[in-house]
Amino acid sequence: QVDLQMSNKRGKQLNKYVPDYVLFDLETTGISANYDEVIEISGVKVRGGKIIDEFSTLVNPGRTIPYGASAVNHIYDEMVADAPEFEEVLPLFLAFIGNDILVGHNIAAFDMKFLYRDFEKYMGLILPNDFVDTLRLAKIVFPDWKHRRLGDLANYYGISTVGAHRALTDCKMNQKVFELLGKELSGEGTMDVRQNVKTCPKCGMMMVKRKGKFGEFWGCKGFPDCRYTENI
C-alpha cells in the first residue's frame, strides 16, 4: 500500500540489483514526454527474482496513433478504441506497484518522465518509488559496447526477442536481463566485473582507480552524481 499523503518528492535512481521489484514498460505515441501519450502499460511483480504477478492493458490516448509508432509497437487505433484512458488505468497501476522499486530499460530518460507527468496531472501525486534503469547497469557491466539496447542484451544472453516492442513481452525479456545483470554485478555472471573493483558504499556502483593531484584514489563510477572517494 503506497502512502499518497507522504509522497512529496520523487524517488531516486539506484544503480544496483534488487531481488524484489516491479519491472514495467510503456508503449507510447512517440518519444516526447511533452507531447506524446501512453498507449500500453505493462508490469511484472517480482519477488526473489521470480515473477509472481502481471499487469497489462492497452490505453486509449484520445488521439490518432502515428504510423511511425505503430510500425514499431504494432499497436493501431482500432486496438485502443475501446481501451480505458490513462486516467482510469493509473490508480490500478499504482495499486499494483505499491511501494516497490521500479525497474526498466532506459526508464530514467523515457518511461519515468511519462509516469511522473501523468501521475501529477491525473492524480496530483508525486511518484515516490525509487527506480533502477537496466540501461545504466548495462553501461557499468559492458562499458565497451557501442549499443546497449534491450534487444542487444537479450541477444547476448540468448533470450528470445520474439514479440519485442509490446510492453508485456518486453517486461519479461527485461526481467531476465536484469537478473543476469545482477549476477554480473555480484561477480557470478559471464564476466567478473568486480575483478579489482570495490563497490561504493554510498550508491552501490563500482569504484574505479582515478588519478588526482595527490596520486591515485578510489572514485565512484557514478561521478558526477555520486562524488564518494576513498584513499588507496
Region spans (language model):
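Conserved non-catalytic scaffold segment of RNase H-like nuclease domains
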Residues: 2-116, 120-128, 143, 147-165
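Conserved beta-strand -> loop -> alpha-helix junction used to position metal-binding or nucleic-acid-contacting
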Residues: 125-138
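Residues immediately within or flanking Cys/His clusters that coordinate Zn2+
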Residues: 151, 197, 217, 223
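Acidic, divalent-metal-coordinating active-site segment for phosphoryl/phosphodiester hydrolysis
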Residues: 166-179
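Short, flexible, mixed-charge glycine/proline-rich loop motifs
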Residues: 185-197, 210-213
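Short cysteine-rich clusters marking metal-coordination/redox-active sites
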Residues: 200-203, 220
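Short cysteine/histidine-rich zinc-coordinating motifs and their immediately flanking basic loops
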Residues: 211-217, 231-232
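Short metal-binding segments enriched for Cys and/or His
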Residues: 224-232
